[in-house]
Amino acid sequence: MVFQQGALFEWMSVRENVGFGPSMKSMPKNDKKEIVDHLLDVVGLQEFKEKAVYELSGGMQQRVALARCLANDPDVILMDEPLGALDALTREKMQSLVLKLWKETGKTIILITHSVEEALLLGERLIVMAPRPGRIHKEYRLPFAELGVNADLREVKKHPEFGPRREEILNMIWDMEEEIMGTKEDAA
């Protein structure tokens, strides 16, 4: 699981954080080192492996959290608002990294986000939830994640279906919010 706040062990180095799961499984040291080194290469943090995580930027900490999750080799990765606190450029780079890892590993990734644009870019399926009670309001099948694996995400946003789909979902959410707040105007 990858959280909005990295949930890293502050007293450990980057390498120790990524290797924590394999250590708990009593993995042989050579195997653990190979996995940790590979994942640090994948997330671009090899040169920071001996740094304490509190010395890293937010984006770097999220990459450590992602590598730590992958070191456990889960079948399913749950990401709960993992990019929400990042600046726009770092967020876009992390979105590209998530797509790359999704394609390379074949892992199922469940991403929880409040960003419609992020959901469109990273999801093959997008589920819009309705509140009170929480339930599925609408589900979409999307082509954008597959396109984003091999293209700059800024180009994917220019796809002719992207903007209209984004507006449709935002309008749907806006309407649900107005219903909840009791501010929706009835069409006469």
Language-model-detected regions and their locations in the chain:
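Conserved H-loop
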Residues: G106-I112
